C-alpha cells in the first residue's frame, strides 16, 4: 500500500536555505514507468500548489446531516458561498511570497490552487528534488519521486502537483472494448435483438424506464467529464439519434485547464466521450447535457511552451473539481458521470485524499458524482509499489473515495449476471464509511467463508471503503454506438456509469417537478431507503490477479499472481455489482416519497 510519509529533510530555495520536510515520497517509480533522462535545468515546468482547506474534519458529519433521509436538514444543500464560509482555504500570502523569493513571478490563482511556471532548475532547488522524464508506452511525463516544502508552510499546503502522481499511459482513440460493426439500417424502437446488442430500447426494458418523459425545463441537468484529450463528437451524436429515432438533441461543452474540443474525426480522441454522451442521451433525453473537457496542463502561463500531446495524459482531477466548485449551483449539472480512473496505489495518498474531499464538497452542494469502478476485476497489476513487491488486490481510484458513487458492471441479458471485469473490492486508503457498514458486514459475515477471509486478508483490507455501490450493464452483449460516423460495439463500466447517470438525472427531474431538492450525495440514501429499488445480482463473479491485463489480454510485466482470486455476486451488497442494477420506476416512487 502506498503511503505519503513525512520525513525530516533540507529544503534549498533560491532565496536562502531553509529547513523543511519531505512532503511526499514514492518508494519506487510506479509500475510500467521507466526513467528516460533527468530534465535540463532550462526546461520549463508548470506546477500547482494546492492550498489546504480548513475544517475538513467536519466534512463527513455535515454530509451525514444533509444526505441522510429522515434528518431535519435532509436535502438542504449548500451553495458555493456556504462552502467557502464553512471550509475556507488557507491564505496564499506566505506561499506567494515563498515563490517570489525564489524569483518566480508567473503566478495565478484558480480556486484553492496557486499555479506557477518556472524552470526545472528553479523547481529542483525550491523543492529540494530532481525532476526527470519518465516514459510508459506512448506517454512521457516530467515527474519526480519526492519533494520537500518549508516547515513554515506545512499547514498552508496540501500538496504540489504534478509531482509524484504519474497517472496512466496514453489511451487509444477508441475504448479498449470497441469493435467495428458493419453498416446497419435505421433502427425502430424494438428490443427484439437485445440478446445481441444493447440499444436504447433495451435499456428501457432492462431498467424499467417505462414511458416516463423528462421535462427539459425542469432544471435537471446531467454532465460528464472528459480527460486524456477526449472530446465527444456532435456529428456522431446526431447519427446515433437518427439511428435510434431519438429526437435531435445536442450537448454543450465547457473547457477546463486547456482542454480542447476537437470535432475532427481524423484527429480527435472520442471513443470514451462518445460512449458517455450517447448513452446519457439514450436514457435521459431531452434533459440538457454538458461535457467538461479538462486538459492536462494549466493554460494561464504566458511565454511558456505548451506540453506535447505525450506529456498531457494525466487525469487532472484537482483542476477539474476546483473548476466545478468555483461555479454556483445554478451553473452546474446535478449529476456528473466520470469514466476514468487509476490503480489506487499509483495515486499518491495526499492527492487522493485532496481529490476525495473536493468530491465531498460537491456532494454538500447537491451534486451526485459518479465514477465507473473500472474494468480490471480484482486487479491487473496485483503487486504493491511500496518497494516490498507484495502481491495484493488492486482497488481503483476515484471509485474508492467514500464521497463518490462507484458504478460496477453486469453482463448478459434477461437475466443479468456479474461481469467478470467489474472492478471492486476494498480501499487501502479510505476506511469503511458509515453508510455502508451494515451492508458490508452482512456480506462478510454471511457470504464469505472464514477460510476465504483468512486467505484474502493478506491481499486486501476488509476494513476499507468497499466498492462498487451499484452497477449497470457493461459487456456481452455490447452496446451499439457511433464513432467517427461508423457503427461500433463497445462497453465496460465506462458504459455503465453514464447509463446510471441518465437514470439519476431522471430521478432529479421527477423530484424537481414535485418541488423537491435534487438527490445530491447519493450513498446514504442508496444503502437505506433506495436499496429496495435495485434488482439484486446474485450470479457471476469478477476475476483478476492472474498475470493478464483483462483490458488488453496481454501479460502484465511484473504483475502479481494470486490463485483463486475472485469476488462472487451474492444476495445483498457484493464487491462486483454493489447493491445491484436500478429499477427506475421503483426508484422514482421511493425518491418522491422523501
What are these language model-derived features?
Residues 21-108, 115, 120-372, 376-406, ...:
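Substrate-binding/charge-relay-adjacent region of secreted/lumenal peptidase catalytic domains
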Residues 501-509:
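Short glycine/serine- and small hydrophobic-enriched flexible loop segments
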Residues 401-436:
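Non-catalytic alpha/beta scaffold blocks inside enzyme catalytic domains
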